[in-house]
């Protein structure tokens, strides 16, 4: 807490400060250049609104000026998370680590979609619950809905009448009739009551703060039909409305802090739940421009906040943002240098009265104010009469001061008073708890009585969710105690007050607490000793529940938490520092990555983008976290500045991280210099996973420089080698030879399974590192490809049986779990078994059925054959984008095409990327999703981009596809492109979800000819022609950029950089070689050595050449050789007399029998094969 400087001195300081700003023109221009264009742009677009509030409502946006504005424009950036599937009413509170996993997931929506069809239920909800933390903006949102409807901008066609009720005011009424209730909900009567009630399906009732009053809204007379003029208790009337006894067709919008509404509304139907997540990054900045009338003050204030990541994160909560702005404004008015060093909401609240309330009122009148707040909280009251104020000892002068400073507000409609915000009332109530002693007026309330009152008010389950309790923890921390002693000029007994915290913790211990609520309390307290003790206790008391996604044997090692907001992420990562049991932290998990589940870990789920401030806080905390050894950020799209901040942490001497997963993080060669600096800095890092990133040759060379440094401790590096040049791969192999401890691996394996007794589809996972240890750390060769099945013993080769039918065979050697990365298929088998897999086309089966009208294809179609009973589970891939870990199986079906017709089977489980069938029966089968036709274009899907190139004499031709992530489609495109000698270039897929039927614009660097420039994302069967854009590059002497943007919003959804080195060999040599084409070797002669060594099935090749190139005598002479290598040598010996046309026939036959070998040789040679 800063001392208030003398006024004269402070004015001098302000003058000096402003003078320095004027003199320092460079800094001043930087400020203006950074903020003025954004401000001017927002002003022109009307995106910096001044929201008008009635005097009786909470004024979080001071109205400096009033003007008409488009309210809907303000809703578009407000983060609203709609839950896909309603929660179990008995488990509506996030109670433990395990129950905090994303059971139902959700998706971001706009305010216009609140009463639209729910993706989970396909029905329009009659009841929408807006939930969220204290001060998150629920009430403001509800009022803006009413105002936007009134101005014709929202729901005007849906509702004829919208009624708004503040439940805190409604609770003051004892009895009301339905007519009186409707009259209260209207500013001005709009129609006779009979006319209003004649169309109940056109009525919307908004009940703000439904959980605030101390009532139970039970439908006590469900069979009794009351007249609209008959008066009854308010809680009974509302209970009848919500219970559908009265106006069953009406619509309702409720706002509430808690999701556990069943105890307040026993007859509550299953609602659509929408969570308000607070201000986005840009909204926090915009708020400062709304609050401060002076533009320069707004810029100065926001710059100060922006420089403090913790303070910026706290501003995610709108009421805290208001608190920060109010404190900064007071400092400006008092001539102080702007300074807010608060790290918690409690510290900010303590700052508020010290700046706004004069010294003369602090000691006595603030205590009376705290008593008023506490009485209101215990009795669920937020409105107070003048007699209530007098009863607590508040004199007129003090009340006038509190009104002037904004601590209290006077309600013009009811001549009553309230605190500026309910959270502020709860803060003062918390102070009252601490200041209480046995002689004060609250019934000789002692320590136990305080705790019992808190439990009675909030309940044991919700105790740590209550702002009053969180403020108590903050006030009883060391900094909180100092702040109160300074505010009240008194001395508090630290030991006695600490005992109160243990009483609160003890009362909740028999019941499973909300883990996130408890973490919030611990964060507010900031006491290291308390944090260490409580977090250590959590290790033994919190165990996973039935929804834990961890595998059954090891699930007690996994703690899982949903962190929807930046604030929750900051709180969780701060507290994890003191959780000694956790060894690995995983953020925003998409899939299980390739590491051991046996290592205790914490999984933080997040569906909304993470701001730079949150990344900075996370990495700062990691510097001092001694227990964490692993960090998994896979699936997060990381900006360069974020990786820069991460690498600064990894280079910090105290950082203990040993394993880092950055799979599919959008990394490019530019990032590799940062990672190389970590490898060269004597860091503790020993394992690094970088698959599914576009690092390129240049990036990997930078990594090699770091690996060569003698202080580098890295022992395992995972990369995608398929896109690297032979020269870079050789460089990596040389590094391995020089450093026996270093293992560089390709092929990303999501799991490596080890069979155990009683193993089911959730087999125990073990890491590559563990397997290496079990094998005695012997050097391992890179074996297998993405087409192989990876199992307990490593890769199992997949055999091509019939190329025309796309029929494959795999012989699984033992019991275990096997996964094929390229197809997404996953089998759990009980014994050795041979499985045949045929790629099928949906059009062969679906076109003649009505299924395509009611269901949408969401995955590939396979015809699988296996011995009955050998396969205990099959995982079938799908491309619906599910952000949660476990989705409902209600709408997903597995379609079986059998002789007698179609069978739709409900999968046992649905997870991101696949469905699970236990003890399956096999036939042509694949995933479908039950839909209504109108929703087909609103299902988020995972997509891929495919780029192919062919080198011509004067130019390069590219083919660019945007298709759903379906291996059968990719295989069909690969085959078609290979016919015309096009070679695929591997680039990362789009990060965002896309939608079937959406259109996208393809663009790129200058001098590119693109036809067509517009692509539609659609699902076409693998037998159908796939849409693509053809791109001509006249002279690719330098890199080119390709982009795909959403046509509607022109938002960038995908970007790739193509360099001349991607088209190997280098283009100048290719261009010159093509001019001398007659002198170039044919493919057959160019790759003689590799073909002799790698062609494994010579007889099928000979059969295709028999009669065309080989006569009977030559055919038998080659077959007479003993080994495949000898047969190929004999064939090449005969080929000396062949013409180019004969060699072309050999090349075509080789493509049909050994397509992957031809593709591999083409890629390594740059795709040039003349005569083919």
UniProtKB/Swiss-Prot annotation:
In contrast to allele 1, does not undergo autocatalytic cleavage within the FIIND domain and its mode of activation remains unclear. In contrast to alleles 1 and 2, allele 3 is not activated by Val-boroPro (Talabostat, PT-100). Not activated by cleavage by B.anthracis lethal toxin (LT) endopeptidase. Not activated by metabolic inhibitors, such as 2-deoxy-D-glucose and sodium azide. The keyword Transcription does not apply. Pfam families: CARD (PF00619), FIIND (PF13553), NACHT (PF05729), NLRC4_HD2 (PF17776), NOD2_WH (PF17779), UPA-FIIND (PF23679). Residues 923-1072 are annotated as: UPA. Expressed in macrophages. It is found in: Cytoplasm, Cytosol. Keywords: ATP-binding, Cytoplasm, Immunity, Inflammatory response, Innate immunity, Leucine-rich repeat, Nucleotide-binding, Repeat. In contrast to allele 1 and 2, not able to mediate autocatalytic cleavage. Residues 789-922 are annotated as: ZU5. ATP binds at residues 132-139. Residues 1-22 are annotated as: Disordered. Residues 789-1072 form the FIIND domain. Residues 126-435 form the NACHT domain. LRR repeats lie at residues 627-647, 684-704. May act as the sensor component of the Nlrp1b inflammasome, which mediates inflammasome activation in response to various pathogen-associated signals, leading to subsequent pyroptosis. Inflammasomes are supramolecular complexes that assemble in the cytosol in response to pathogens and other damage-associated signals and play critical roles in innate immunity and inflammation. Three tandem Nrlp1 paralogs, Nrlp1a, Nrlp1b and Nrlp1c, have been identified. Nlrp1c is predicted to be a pseudogene. In macrophages and dendritic cells, NLRP1 inflammasome activation of CASP1 and IL1B maturation can be dampened by direct contact with activated effector and memory T-cells. This effect may be mediated by hexameric TNF ligands, such as CD40LG. Belongs to the NLRP family. This is NACHT, LRR and PYD domains-containing protein 1b allele 3. It comes from Mus musculus (Mouse).
């Amino acid at each position: 807490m800063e001392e208030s400087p003398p006024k004269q001195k402070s004015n001098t300081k302000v003058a000096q400060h402003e003078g320095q700003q004027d003199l320092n023109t460079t800094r001043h221009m930087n400020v203006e250049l950074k903020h003025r264009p954004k401000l001017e742009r927002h002003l022109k677009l009307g995106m910096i609104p001044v929201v008008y509030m009635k005097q009786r409502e909470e004024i979080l946006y001071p109205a400096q000026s009033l003007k008409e504005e488009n309210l809907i424009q303000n809703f578009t950036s407000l983060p609203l998370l709609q839950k896909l599937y309603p929660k179990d009413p008995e488990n509506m509170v996030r109670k433990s680590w395990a129950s905090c996993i994303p059971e139902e997931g959700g998706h971001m929506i706009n305010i216009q979609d609140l009463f639209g069809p729910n993706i989970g239920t396909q029905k329009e909800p009659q009841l929408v619950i807006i939930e969220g933390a204290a001060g998150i903006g629920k009430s403001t949102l509800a009022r803006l809905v009413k105002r936007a409807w009134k101005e014709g901008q929202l729901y005007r066609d849906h509702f004829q009448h919208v009624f708004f009720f503040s439940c805190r005011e409604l609770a003051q009424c004892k009895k009301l009739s339905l007519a009186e209730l409707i009259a209260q909900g209207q500013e001005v009567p709009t129609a006779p009551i009979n006319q209003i009630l004649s169309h109940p399906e056109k009525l919307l009732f908004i009940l703000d703060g439904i959980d605030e009053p101390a009532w139970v809204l039970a439908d006590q007379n469900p069979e009794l039909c009351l007249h609209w003029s008959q008066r009854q208790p308010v809680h009974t009337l509302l209970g009848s409305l919500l219970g559908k006894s009265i106006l069953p067709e009406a619509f309702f919008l409720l706002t509430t802090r808690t999701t556990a509404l069943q105890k307040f509304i026993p007859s509550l139907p299953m609602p659509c739940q929408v969570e308000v997540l607070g201000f986005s990054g840009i909204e926090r900045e915009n708020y400062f421009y709304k609050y401060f009338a002076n533009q320069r003050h707004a810029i100065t204030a926001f710059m100060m906040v922006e420089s403090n990541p913790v303070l910026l994160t706290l501003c995610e909560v709108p009421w805290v943002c208001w608190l920060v702005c109010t404190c900064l404004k007071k400092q400006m008015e008092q001539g102080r240098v702007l300074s807010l060093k608060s790290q918690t909401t409690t510290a900010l609240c303590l700052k508020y009265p010290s700046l706004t309330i004069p010294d003369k009122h602090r000691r006595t009148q603030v205590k009376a104010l705290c008593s008023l707040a506490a009485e209101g909280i215990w009795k669920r009251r937020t409105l107070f009469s003048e007699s209530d104020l007098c009863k607590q000892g508040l004199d007129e002068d003090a009340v006038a001061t509190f009104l002037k400073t904004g601590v209290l507000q006077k309600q013009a409609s009811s001549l009553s008073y309230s605190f500026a915000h309910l959270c502020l009332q709860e803060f003062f109530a918390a102070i009252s708890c601490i200041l209480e002693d046995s002689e004060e007026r609250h019934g000789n309330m002692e320590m136990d009585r305080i705790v019992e009152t808190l439990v009675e008010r909030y309940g044991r389950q919700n105790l740590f969710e209550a702002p009053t309790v969180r403020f108590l923890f903050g006030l009883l921390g060391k900094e909180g105690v100092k702040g109160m002693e300074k505010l009240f000029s008194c001395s508090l007994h630290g030991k006695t007050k600490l005992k109160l915290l243990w009483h609160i913790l003890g009362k909740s211990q028999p019941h499973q607490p909300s883990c996130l609520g408890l973490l919030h309390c611990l964060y507010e307290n900031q006491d290291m000793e308390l944090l260490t003790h409580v977090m250590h206790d959590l290790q033994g008391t919190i165990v996973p529940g039935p929804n834990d996604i961890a595998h059954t044997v090891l699930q007690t090692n996994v703690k899982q938490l949903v962190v929807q907001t930046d604030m929750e992420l900051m709180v969780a990562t701060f507290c994890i520092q003191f959780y000694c049991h956790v060894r690995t932290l995983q953020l925003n998990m998409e899939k299980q990555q390739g590491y051991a589940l046996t290592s205790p870990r914490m999984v933080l789920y997040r569906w909304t983008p993470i701001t730079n401030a949150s990344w900075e806080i996370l990495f700062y905390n990691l510097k001092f976290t001694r227990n964490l050894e692993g960090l998994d950020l896979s699936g997060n799209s990381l900006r360069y500045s974020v990786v820069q901040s991460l690498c600064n942490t990894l280079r910090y001497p105290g950082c203990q991280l040993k394993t880092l997963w950055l799979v599919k993080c959008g990394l490019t060669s530019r990032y590799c210099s940062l990672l190389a600096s970590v490898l060269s800095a004597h860091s503790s890092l020993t394992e690094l996973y970088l698959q599914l990133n576009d690092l390129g040759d240049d990036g990997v060379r930078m990594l090699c420089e770091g690996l060569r440094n003698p202080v580098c401790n890295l022992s395992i590096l995972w990369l995608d080698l398929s896109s690297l040049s032979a020269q870079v791969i050789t460089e990596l192999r040389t590094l391995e030879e020089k450093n026996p401890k270093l293992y560089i691996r390709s092929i990303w394996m999501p799991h490596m399974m080890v069979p155990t007794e009683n193993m089911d589809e959730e087999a125990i996972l073990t890491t590559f590192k563990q397997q290496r240890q079990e094998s005695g750390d012997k050097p391992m060769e890179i074996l297998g490809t993405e087409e192989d099945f990876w199992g307990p013993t490593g890769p199992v080769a997949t055999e091509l049986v019939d190329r025309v039918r796309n029929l494959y065979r795999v012989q699984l050697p033992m019991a275990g779990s096997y996964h094929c990365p390229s197809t997404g298929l996953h089998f759990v088998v009980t014994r050795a078994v041979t499985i045949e897999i045929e790629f099928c086309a949906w059009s062969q089966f679906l076109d003649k059925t009505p299924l395509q009208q009611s269901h949408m294809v969401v995955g590939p179609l396979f015809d699988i054959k296996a011995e009955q009973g050998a396969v205990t589970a099959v995982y079938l891939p799908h491309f619906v984008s599910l952000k949660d870990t476990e989705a409902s199986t209600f709408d997903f079906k597995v379609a079986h095409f059998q002789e007698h017709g179609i069978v739709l089977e409900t999968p046992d489980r649905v997870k991101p990327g696949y469905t699970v069938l236990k003890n399956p029966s096999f036939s042509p089968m694949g995933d479908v999703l039950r839909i209504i036709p109108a929703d087909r274009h609103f299902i988020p899907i995972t997509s891929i981009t495919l780029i192919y190139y062919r080198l011509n004499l004067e130019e390069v031709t590219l083919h660019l596809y945007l298709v759903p992530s379906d291996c059968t489609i990719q295989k069909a495109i690969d085959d078609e492109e290979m016919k015309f000698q096009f070679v695929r270039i591997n680039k990362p897929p789009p990060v965002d979800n896309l939608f079937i039927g959406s259109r996208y614009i393809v663009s790129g660097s200058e001098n590119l000819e693109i036809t067509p420039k517009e692509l539609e994302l659609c699902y076409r069967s693998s037998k159908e022609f796939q849409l693509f854009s053809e791109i001509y590059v006249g002279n690719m002497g330098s890199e080119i950029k390709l982009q795909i943007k959403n046509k509607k919003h022109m938002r960038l959804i995908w970007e790739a950089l193509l360099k001349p080195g991607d088209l190997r060999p280098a283009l100048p040599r290719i261009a010159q070689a093509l001019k001398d084409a007659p002198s170039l070797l044919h493919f057959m002669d160019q790759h003689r050595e590799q073909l002799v060594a790698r062609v494994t099935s010579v007889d099928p090749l000979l059969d295709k050449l028999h009669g065309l190139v080989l006569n009977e005598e030559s055919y038998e002479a080659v077959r007479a050789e003993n080994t495949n290598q000898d047969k190929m040598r004999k064939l090449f010996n005969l080929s000396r007399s062949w013409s180019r046309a004969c060699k072309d026939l050999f090349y075509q036959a080789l493509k049909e029998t050994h397509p992957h070998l031809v593709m591999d040789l083409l890629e390594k040679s740059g795709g040039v094969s003349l005569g083919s």
